[in-house]
Amino acid sequence: MLEDTWEEEIWEYKSKRKPKPVHPNNCSENISESVEKSTDGKHQSKGNEKRTSENPGKTKDHKVCLAETDSQISAGSSQSSSCRDESQQSQNKETTPKKQHRTRRGKQVTPKVRPVYDGYCPSCQMPFSSLLGQTPQWHVFECLDSPPISDTECPEGLLCTSTIPSHYKKYTHILLAQSRDSKEPLGSPSDALAGLFAAAAPGSPCNLEERRSMTLKTENLRKVSDHSLLMMQYLETSQPSAEINRKNVSSPCSQTSPVPQCAEFVKRDQLVGGGSPLAEVALNSQSKSGSMGLPLPENDTDSCEISYSPLHSDEETYDIDQELDDSQQELFFTQSSKDSSLEEDGSAIFENLHGPSPKEAEGIRPTAKSLVAQARCSAPSEGSTLSDSFLLLSYTSNRLSQEDLPHTDAAFHLLSPALAVGGAASNYQTSKAKLDEPEKFLSLASSHQQQKIETSAVGNQTSLPLLTRARSKPLEKEGGKCLPLHPTQSQTRGSPRKGLGAPGANCACRNAQKRSSMPLDKPLGTSPSSPKCSPSQPSKKVMKQMDIGVFFGLPPKRQETSLRESASEGPNVSPVVSPNQKRPRLCKRKAQSSLSDLEFDAKNLNESQHSVGLSGEKRQHRRKRHKTSNSPREGPCQRRSGHLMNNPELGPVSLSKAFVRRTRGRTQRGNMNISESSGAGEVRRTCPFYKRIPGTGFTVDAFQYGEIEGCTAYFLTHFHSDHYAGLSKDFTRPVYCSEITGNLLKKKLRVQEQYIRQLPMDTECVVDSVKVVLLDANHCPGATMILFQLPNGAVILHTGDFRADPSMERSRLAGRKVHTLFLDTTYCSPEYTFPSQQEVIQFAINTAFEAVTLNPRALVVCGTYCIGKEKVFLAIADVLGSKVGMSQEKYKTLQCLNIPEVSSLITTDMCDSLVHLLPMMQINFKGLQSHLKKCGGKYDQILAFRPTGWTHSNNITSTADIIPQTRGNISIYGIPYSEHSSYLEMKRFVQWLKPQKIIPTVNVGSFRSRNTMEKYFKEWRLEAGY
């Protein structure tokens, strides 16, 4: 425990004694860093009071000092404004400044408020604002004493804004630490910004808004729309009479002084929501550069690499929705441009009004105002507080209009589509005189509540061409000053556009109906004279299961259920989730370069796709494609280039992690935990541990996972599709297998011979310093068990698919001490007790011989897979003295075995054989009746065998229990001939081998199944006494 740590700060103890009155002249002008700061601004801790009283001499009016302190605290706490769990609780307890004075003069007990600290832990990078009952010094010492649990780097990297303490124990944040060490931390208050805050005059409009903002805090942020109206009033009072010269490369501080005042108001309102981290970066960087009067460096864009859509944790999203569920806001805006036609795609509705842009002739840049407004219209609602975004963008766009082009481009990268609704505010600075034209407003439903549909999560994504197209065309007019951008397909095919979002555009904002959402069934025409407001539909509210926040005194979380819309009505604006699923993280996308429409279609054919600048015919075609692909039960990340990639083996998919899709060398992130191979286009999954050989770089039967990192040799046990899945002629890594399996790979799959390593049976070979022996697995031709002997002496046996037999006890396994056994557990349950293979083969021989003896025109049919069951039909053919007739394809497959006994008994002449082979799926009455007709009347009876272990039952413990299914002249015997070990055979093999560790390789998908098999393994050990 540190000596300077106050006990009341640790225990959050507040004395009930009357605090000493603070003289108005004793207010400190600057609050020192790393000192406890309260977000509500109504009192300091006792430690701060003591430090304040020790600094007499610095005099200032008490009210001005209080307001300044509040603004500095707000700026200092911007590091943790992306998640305001603590701030919202403290804001609910806030009072106005007048009430504060009464509290200080009276004996009323001060409400207990949890302190919020600035800064980050230098060890784990956790923000100090997330501390509960700890001081920063206390946490740092504990963090240094207890190393992190995992060495896994945080998947969000530099964009991590989590405020959950356990998150920083579960993941490391090395990249974030390096970034904060090499430059000023993102969102930290700059001295220049603080100086601009302090420079505000007492009589400035910001001081008036200061009191208004304090009044708004008492409303617990329940009416977010009031902020928008308040911003209009502020802009009317603070806008300078003469317009700022936008041609200046570096503006003096005197020209930018009104902007930090607005920023002060924004910061004091405590920006909350998904866009807050990026908003603070833009605010700090712009205000700092403005105060220094220097242009931003051109490499800021490359160094920031900030994604357009920030991610939220579940806790962050809860707090955001808690505010937004109580908000009532709709934005009305219009946009003026020359010859600009935007395609309406369901996420927002535009109406373009033709208006003159007199400043365009003067060489003035269109800036990012219209671009930001377009980005908002194409972006999904991300749960951010729209009024805060509104205020921030009015400040940012004003700064953008004064800076050189690199400034505009750098700041544009910092803007999030979630904040882009504030683009409406950007035009207030130039269209003040036209704010009284309500008939020109176009309503845009914010739809920020998260809507729910029963089964699927639809996370809308923003069309990147919408942003880049709007940026690249106006910037090209500047003659080489813009950053290199690849022109989009919409630019190539569409007509040229002129200066979207010119400064003369009319824009305004007002409140509208409560909780409304726009119907998106048809596009809105671009009429310059008669703009219309689209009707809105109220959403229905449903109460869900009580959440944990209610236990801690928070209001119950309310969630919206949107009405089901048909495909013709277009997609939902808000992401929807299943009632039983977690909320999906919003997709984040890199803002590196523009994508053409065709590239984007290949990657993102979903409901939220937006396109711009297409011709009328193309637009109609695209619209039809959207309508045919819209389905309320499909998530956006499930579509791949016009078709669905549904794989039941994927299992539950985590939507809170990054989902990487690769198309033409580009990567885009979404909300699933799988990746797609850029070459084969197949879904790639992580190779499970039971297919990796520990201590080596070997994998066994793991071709469906693509190229596995760290794998030096791929082993294939046998040629069955569930084991060689993913192996094709394009595979270029070494494949180790038996000679028969290698032949099948060459002939059937066309795998290049140079990559096939055929190993002899029962012979010790060395592969990467590991001794390898292939043993007969008694499963199908070429099937092997693989015995590995590592350089350290460890012995590992992988059985692949095998049928245990007593003859294995006389193989090279005899006398071996096996440390780890990878066991085929297909039938690892006592109910699987079927006869041995020899008994079943003998039963089939006797039955077939009897039937043919009684009826010489009887035909024997055996069902087979690609390879396997050869012992059954070869034994029957040998007894009957006949060849086995089969299809041409099956004949070629069996010829690959290079077994003389097999080659001498097979033929493609069906009429010259008494035994026929058919696919296993055709062994039914309908298929056999059809096959009998094909024989041309040569046979009048069929005796069929379906050799599979899946037909067993508890009553079949011997061949005497086998009863055929008969219909007319067709009889089908389901014989329990399995090529996998029965439970008793498996038990005998394990008890003989006595491995130290058993790893099951089949039926391991559930914890219950794995736990059950572990119990069996323990019983076997106890019985065998090892």
UniProtKB/Swiss-Prot annotation:
Keywords, sorted A to Z: Cell cycle, Cell division, DNA damage, DNA repair, Hydrolase, Isopeptide bond, Metal-binding, Mitosis, Nucleus, Phosphoprotein, Ubl conjugation, Zinc, Zinc-finger
InterPro entries: DRMBL (IPR011084), Rad18_UBZ4 (IPR006642), RibonucZ/Hydroxyglut_hydro (IPR036866)
EC number: 3.5.2.6
Basic residues bias locations: 98-107, 619-628
Ranges where the record places region Nuclear localization region: 1-189
Domain of life where this protein originates: Eukaryota
EC top class, as a word: hydrolase
Catalytic activity: a beta-lactam + H2O = a substituted beta-amino acid
Sites of Phosphoserine modification: S574, S578
Subcellular localization(s) per the UniProt record: Nucleus
GO MF, any single term: zinc ion binding
GO cellular component, one term: nucleus
Keyword 4Fe-4S included in the entry's annotation: no
A Pfam short name: DRMBL
Region (Nuclear focus formation): 401-602
Biased composition (Polar residues): 569-581
Basic and acidic residues: compositionally biased ranges: 34-65
Covalent link Glycyl lysine isopeptide (Lys-Gly) (interchain with G-Cter in SUMO2), residues: K359, K434, K522, K657
Family under the similarity heading: Belongs to the DNA repair metallo-beta-lactamase (DRMBL) family.
Assembly mode: Binds constitutively to TP53BP1. Binds CDC27, which is itself a component of the anaphase promoting complex (APC). Binds PIAS1.
Free-text function comment from the UniProt entry: May be required for DNA interstrand cross-link repair. Also required for checkpoint mediated cell cycle arrest in early prophase in response to mitotic spindle poisons.
Name recorded for this polypeptide: DNA cross-link repair 1A protein
Lineage: Eukaryota, Metazoa, Chordata, Craniata, Vertebrata
Gene symbol of the encoding locus: Dclre1a
